A protein has these predicted regions:
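Short coil/turn segments at secondary-structure boundaries
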Residues: 67, 71, 128-131, 169, ...
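Glycine-rich beta-alpha loop segments
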Residues: 82, 92-94, 100, 105-157, ...
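Short active-site-adjacent helix-start/loop capping segments
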Residues: 70-72, 120-122, 164-166
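Intrinsically disordered, low-complexity segments enriched in small/flexible residues
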Residues: 1-109, 277-319
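Terminal peptide-recognition signature
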Residues: 15, 56, 112, 159, ...
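Conserved catalytic cores of soluble enzyme domains
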Residues: 158-288, 292, 296
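Short, motif-level signal for alpha-helix interfacial/capping segments enriched in acidic residues
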Residues: 33-36, 136-137, 230
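Short hinge/gating elements
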Residues: 51, 61-64, 125-129, 270-273
């Protein structure tokens, strides 16, 4: 499968193309090029690490949106055993922009849910590019209530540009559905861990991120509006998205400094899309430790800790 390279990854792409060319030549019996190939691979790895160590906020935004980045279905496949998907909000219908259900995470029964964007044209249309409608958020509430009833921890995975802004969604109460989902997350008497795996866009993201612990992958973003949207409002020019991203404090280090997220999960060199299996395993190890740390808290303590976490936002990192 042909890889998708971002513009700033072009030098890396050129080196990898050269490696493929020499590998094909070597395998055809034309020459022994092992020494040259090893040198090229080392150069590529060094360049990849250097490139990703100095990404600016706009470049991180592009990485967060990378089409080959692992999505919810990949995390479920890699981390959740015996997954049983539950569909529908019992009011209107099912929204595949949010996928959720029951399963076992490293031996522990959990409820898992999150945004799914899709990997190709067909699945992106099926999942509406991860932009949920009201029935998606009401399905999330239904799953949260089930988790509370059976005393199961909740794992959520956030990756959305925002809730779907269509007329039908507004007619069916989009704002109310987002608010109810956020409210339910804040009052659950079980552990809740949210992970921003790509884009965390506006209320559509917060509805699944009212958690005891909010994690974020190293090159993910989390914001009230997209850089393009902010540029359109501030300067009436969406093409100034890079300028907006530089000002918005949407990257993981800035969010951690302000207390909006609690932990940054390191990505493989070259981003999560460069080695999805390593990314999934790394996140699984972090989630396991986070769940263990919360296993000693009572239901009342979980609710209080979660509320206090959000009360404290805005009290640090702003000086």
């Amino acid at each position: 499968m042909m890889r998708h390279y971002l513009e700033f990854e072009r030098p890396i792409a050129d080196l990898e193309a050269k490696i493929e060319e020499l590998s094909a030549l070597s395998q055809s019996g034309g020459a022994n090029l092992d020494v040259e190939l090893d040198a090229l691979r080392q150069r590529t790895e060094v360049l990849r690490r250097e490139t990703y160590s100095r990404l600016d906020p706009w470049q991180k935004t592009l990485v967060a949106r990378h089409p080959e980045r692992p999505h919810l279905v990949d995390y479920i496949s890699g981390l959740i055993e015996d997954f049983v998907e539950l569909r529908g909000d019992r009011k209107f219908g099912d929204d595949q922009a949010i996928v959720g259900g029951l399963g076992r995470f490293r031996g522990q029964s959990v409820v898992v849910m999150g945004h799914e964007k899709g990997h190709d044209t067909a699945t992106r249309l099926k999942h509406n590019f991860g932009m949920a409608r009201p029935e998606g958020y009401r399905k999330a509430v239904r799953l949260m209530e089930m988790a509370e009833q059976f005393g199961l921890p909740v794992l959520t995975f956030v990756d959305t540009a925002g809730a779907y802004p269509g007329i039908g969604a507004e007619e069916r109460g989009q704002a109310e559905a987002i608010a109810r989902s956020t409210e339910k997350g804040l009052t659950l008497r079980v552990p809740v861990i949210a992970t921003v795996t790509g884009e965390g866009g506006s209320g559509g993201a917060i509805a699944l991120a009212a958690a005891n612990r909010v994690l974020i992958l190293e090159h993910s973003i989390y914001s009230v509006i997209s850089p393009e949207g902010a540029a359109s409002i501030l300067w009436h020019d969406g093409s100034r998205a890079k300028d907006a991203a530089d000002q918005m404090k949407i990257t993981a280090p800035d969010l951690l400094k302000m207390g909006i997220v609690d932990r940054i999960v390191e990505e493989p060199a070259g981003g999560a899309h460069s080695d999805p299996e390593v990314m999934i395993e790394t996140l699984g190890n972090v989630l396991e430790k986070e769940l263990q740390a919360m296993s000693f808290l009572s239901p009342d303590q979980l609710v209080e800790q979660r509320a206090q976490r959000f009360y404290d936002i805005g009290r640090k990192g702003l000086s």
